[in-house]
């Protein structure tokens, strides 16, 4: 004869089954919540990456305040790299911190890209204090200028804070020749752009400034200003 299960035993069995079922339900809910959180995190991360400024927007050449040194930025394998165009062209891989801020992977050097009023990236701030200007030329390559482009630079220049000091600029086959009138020393320069020149070893920069279609002044190095006299 089949024995009937006593009520107390039946109640305990139901209680155990209920607890087991509850545990399974809780586990399933936690698992689903984990998947949902992971999906949201992945979706948010993907959305953030899609909204980030493309690395190619930062590529180019940037000139340090001393006018002699340059840094280039280029994209490679979905990473941004910075290369010093001096000191044996040391190269740094950069790690993105947010949309426009990066750090060198091994050294932790900070780099922030800044926009101008037109919304274009025009500067790079190195180490939080050194502002480098983006330039539209490759400082390693000699530019080809016409005779008329070189001729507009020719003339006599007076030092801004001492008119007794004079230099002359004359066109040459390779670029221009600067002559110091106080000692007759001459230095040859080749163009990197229409208005930027370097001497043979790249340690002496000349930057010409134009206003109203005419060359009005020349800056040697960072702040050595000369005014065109003719």
Where are these regions (language model features)?
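N-terminal secretory signal peptides that target proteins for export/translocation
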Residues: 1-18
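Sec-dependent signal peptide recognition
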Residues: 19-25
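Cleavable N-terminal signal peptides
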Residues: 26-27, 37
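Secreted/luminal cysteine- and crosslink-motif detector
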Residues: 30-31, 133
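Peripheral terminal and inter-domain segments
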Residues: 40-230
């Amino acid at each position: 004869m089949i024995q009937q299960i006593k009520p107390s035993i039946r109640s305990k069995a139901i209680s155990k089954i209920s607890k087991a079922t509850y545990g399974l339900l809780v586990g399933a809910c936690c698992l689903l919540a984990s998947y949902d959180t992971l999906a949201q995190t992945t979706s948010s991360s993907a959305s953030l990456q899609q909204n980030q400024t493309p690395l190619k927007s930062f590529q180019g050449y940037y000139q340090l305040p001393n006018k002699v040194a340059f840094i280039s930025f280029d994209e490679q394998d979905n990473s941004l790299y910075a290369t010093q165009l001096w000191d044996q062209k040391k190269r740094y891989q950069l790690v993105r911190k947010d949309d426009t801020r990066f750090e060198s992977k091994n050294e932790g050097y900070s780099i922030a890209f800044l926009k101008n009023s037109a919304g274009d990236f025009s500067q790079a701030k190195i180490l939080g204090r050194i502002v480098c200007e983006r330039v539209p030329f490759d400082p390693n390559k000699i530019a080809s200028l016409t005779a008329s482009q070189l001729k507009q630079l020719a003339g006599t220049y007076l030092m801004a804070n001492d008119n007794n000091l004079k230099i002359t600029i004359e066109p040459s086959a390779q670029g221009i020749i600067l002559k110091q009138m106080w000692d007759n020393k001459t230095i040859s320069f080749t163009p990197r752009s229409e208005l930027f020149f370097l001497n043979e070893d790249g340690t002496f920069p000349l930057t010409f400034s134009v206003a109203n279609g005419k060359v009005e002044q020349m800056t040697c190095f960072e702040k050595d200003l000369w005014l065109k006299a003719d």
